[in-house]
Amino acid sequence: MALALSLSACSPPLRRTRRAGFRTSCSIFANPAQRAKRKLLELISEEDRGLRTQKDPKKRDEIVNAIESMTVIGRSSITTDDSLSATWRLLWTTEKEQLFIIEKAGLFGTTAGDVLQVIDVNKRILNNVITFPPDGVFFVRSDIDIASPQRVNFRFNSAVLRGKNWELPLPPFGKGWFENVYMDGEIRVAKDIRGDYLIVDRAPYNWTESFV
């Protein structure tokens, strides 16, 4: 999934020097954060949200190393403030449960659509959502607490599998935490209590339960 990566404008304009021809006061390369982000997004761009990575340990290691670079860049930032509130759309993960549902959806005559994390920091709510267009959805409701500048604790409180004219409540199951090791206006990179990784972008819409 392509994301637009903005480069800072170069100023002043190009000027000729005696020794080196044209020169500019800004680098033709992006800054370190932009380079690391671009590399990470390129690495995951053909990985089918992580399905292909499961069968390619070398590629997984490359992606994890790129995530570690993003972790260093984001280590002093606050990633649990109001800017965390958003509908986040899955780009890539190592989480086996999510990947299993995405991969096996065809066995039930459907395909997985967007996979989302819907977070509201002020209301202390997290919904994990897997959509099955046009009418199906599986979502897990959770309560959250902000534990640190980058860590969020969560506790599942209910789950629902819903179709067009039916709904199947499921029992809640467990608790844990995740750390947002990097976040900006476009993407978020997280690592959870089990050592799984998640890369998401800000969806172009806000998901609510009224969508289904």
Curated annotation (Swiss-Prot):
It comes from the Eukaryota. Disulfide bonds: none annotated. Pfam families: PAP_fibrillin (PF04755). Keywords: Chloroplast, Plastid, Thylakoid, Transit peptide. InterPro entries: PAP, PAP/fibrillin_dom. Belongs to the PAP/fibrillin family. This is Probable plastid-lipid-associated protein 11, chloroplastic. Residues 1-25 form a transit peptide. It is found in: Plastid, Chloroplast thylakoid. GO terms for cellular component: chloroplast thylakoid.
